[in-house]
Amino acid sequence: MKLRIAVISAILSASVTAYSQEPGPVISESSTLTIEQCRDLALNNNKNLRRGALEVRAAGYQKDEAFAAYLPAIDFAGGYMYNQKKISMFDSDQLLPIKTFDLEKQGYEFNIVKNPMTGEPITVNGQPVPEQVAYLPKDALSYDLHNVFFGAVTLTQPIFMGGKIVAMNKITGYAEELAKSKLDNSARDVVYAVDAAYWQVVSLRAKQALAQSYVNLLDTLSNHVALMIKEGVATRSDQLTVDVKLNSARIDLTKVDNGLVLSRMALAQLCGLPIDTQFTLADEGAENINAPAVRGDSPIDMQDVYDRRYDLRQLELGVKIFEQKANVARSEMMPNLALVGAYSFSNPNIFDGFKKKFNGQFSVGAMLSIPLWHWGGNYNKYRAAKAQTEAMRMELENARELIDLQVRQASYKSEEALRTRRMTEVNLAKADENLHSADVGFSNGVMTLDNVMEAQTAWLKAHSEDIDARIDVYLCDVYLSKVLGTLDFTTPSLRR
């Protein structure tokens, strides 16, 4: 049936990712594991859960990183530069005209060389010639800047970033919730896979005992036929018919033995144990496994189911994240304002005539950035984010519809499994009675060998169907608990 195929797929996919990372309980050859112990082993040793715990931790760090954007950023930058040449303010020595105080004019005037005959200023190349000059050598304004050290300590405090910082903090908060939800959902998947593997082993162990009983029946029948041949009331053909059935039953028993070994290996791997670990399960060999409690006929509150489903919670968080991404895109169309401050210094410094010592100054200001025109790029980015948000909402609605269908299917399968279990119990009693009647009739000579083998085949089929029905009740109940979000288990400390 489809459910059993899904169960086997879950076992195989989950067993690939399970391995032992923490020392668990010591498992000896005489150890008996309950289903709760198998769950605990798997939850403590599953690789996917370990990875999910690290993702939760990383999401927490990213949330702290986003919060830091509210606070001022303090940075230091420094450097060294070698210059090949000195810096000079003049290309040569300079002669600067000077002024003297004129008593008549009550002010400073340039002393100009005048012609003693005419009293007119003497000019050279059209420029008057001063009587006195100040000599300013080139070296006086040349500075040794071969080795320059510089640095600055800066502070940047965001004041208004268009809502980007607020949106990023919400995104990282939702991302942390999303990582936790994924971890819980993965734990639920692991528990479901372990339960499926557990009951698979129990089922095969019961079928192994059934196959052995069937072999014993045929072996006993073969011995009876051999005695009847000696007495002349049976033929060689009857003996061969029984022997063929016996060999076929032994082949089936071998297949069941191999399947049981492989199923134990799959369960051991899920539990994080070496695959060759020898252990028994608490429900192995139980004559009557108590069926799970029958659920009431009260209607299922789908809103409660939605609230308990981690996968649906992930989609809801995805919608919120995309909403905030749209806000981030919108912030790029809004002005950004930040307060900036700095202390800069250098050696040689410009405050003391380029002396070779450190000196610096403080500076404070504000920086405003206003996007003016980007040819619609930012606006299209915002519209794309809004479209992605709507697409995520549609995916969320579709998921709710699929969950409705999934819950109904699981409920029907659970009810079907219970009805099948009741019918197999009736068939089992009839098959046992039929086999007993056939054995008695064959011993009294009123039943043929074919009648006995038909009764044995019907007995085998009835017992096999009963085993499948009992296990299906558990598998369907676990699956229904999973889709309802009520699969109970104790989550280990994975988020440390």
What are these regions (language model features)?
Residues 4, 19-27, 75, 82-109, ...:
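Acidic, low-complexity, intrinsically disordered peripheral segments
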Residues 20-88, 275, 281-320, 371-372, ...:
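Bacterial Sec-pathway N-terminal export signals of envelope proteins
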Residues 39-43, 95-138, 273-340, 489-496:
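Amphipathic alpha-helical coiled-coil scaffold segments and their short linker/junction regions
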Residues 50, 74-88, 138-146, 156-185, ...:
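Small/polar (Gly/Ser/Thr/Ala-rich) solvent-exposed segments
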Residues 51-66, 186, 192-209, 227, ...:
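Amphipathic alpha-helical coiled-coil segments
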Residues 61, 181-304, 413, 417, ...:
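Periplasmic alpha-helical coiled-coil/stalk elements that build and connect Gram-negative outer-membrane
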Residues 80, 153-157, 267, 343, ...:
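Residues on the lipid-exposed face of transmembrane beta-strands in outer-membrane beta-barrel proteins
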Residues 149-155, 301, 362-368, 410:
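Hydrophobic, lipid-facing positions within transmembrane beta-strands of outer-membrane proteins
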